[in-house]
């Protein structure tokens, strides 16, 4: 998100985090150097949409939201929340902690989500005992895809999935994205244990891809 904002010369410093979001969200935003501000919940435990809209402004980089939230409730105003944040120039990050409740039923991208991490141990059967092995793939919207860390995977129009590293990133971007990537560097390791990706894929294939595409 910061890389995308900097690319357009926009220095925003606030991340909004609803009270109903996963407890790690404010810590994550603060660790990334953002100022964190709370958005209150309604009496029924969902994001107060009007309070969110009232706080949006030129200093807000985005919102970190968990859907379903930590109260176990689906954020019914999710699309309206995303539309409001986008209209104000910000981005929407969704915590995938409770994704297993909606996977196959609704697509985060259709709700306006720009970035989301997926907890494979919570949603796609990989082990979590003993502290891991952890694996948290991150998916990005078209707006944020050119600004993600390397390496990452991208599917071209011919259906081929590519693993993008630094040495081929610029050539790939010119051919498929119409311009240079503006990634913020390479991660020291990949997004967790590759073996967990394989196990999650086997789990998905065994159940079928209906509702996942």
Specify the residue positions occupied by each region the protein language model found.
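Conserved PLP-enzyme active-site core in the AAT-like
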Residues: 1-176
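Structural motif of enzymes handling amino- and sulfur-group chemistry
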Residues: 165-213
């Amino acid at each position: 998100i910061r890389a995308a904002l900097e690319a357009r010369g926009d220095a925003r410093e606030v991340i909004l985090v609803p009270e109903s979001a996963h407890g790690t969200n404010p810590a994550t935003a603060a660790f990334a150097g953002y100022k964190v501000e709370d958005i209150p919940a309604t009496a029924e435990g969902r994001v107060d949409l009007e309070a969110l809209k009232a706080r949006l402004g030129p200093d807000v980089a985005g919102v970190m939201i968990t859907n379903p939230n930590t109260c176990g409730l689906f954020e019914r105003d999710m699309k309206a929340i995303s539309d409001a944040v986008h209209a104000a120039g910000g981005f929407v990050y969704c915590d995938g902690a409770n994704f297993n409740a909606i996977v196959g039923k609704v697509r985060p991208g259709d709700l306006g989500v720009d970035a989301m991490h997926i907890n494979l141990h919570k949603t796609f059967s990989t082990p979590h005992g003993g502290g891991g092995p952890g694996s948290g793939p991150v998916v990005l919207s078209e707006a944020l895809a050119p600004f993600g860390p390397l390496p990452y995977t991208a599917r071209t129009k011919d259906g081929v999935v590519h693993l993008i590293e630094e040495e081929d990133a610029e050539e790939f971007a010119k051919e498929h994205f119409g311009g240079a990537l503006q990634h913020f560097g390479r991660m020291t390791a990949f997004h967790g244990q590759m073996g967990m990706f394989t196990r999650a894929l086997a789990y998905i294939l065994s159940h079928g891809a209906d509702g996942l595409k």
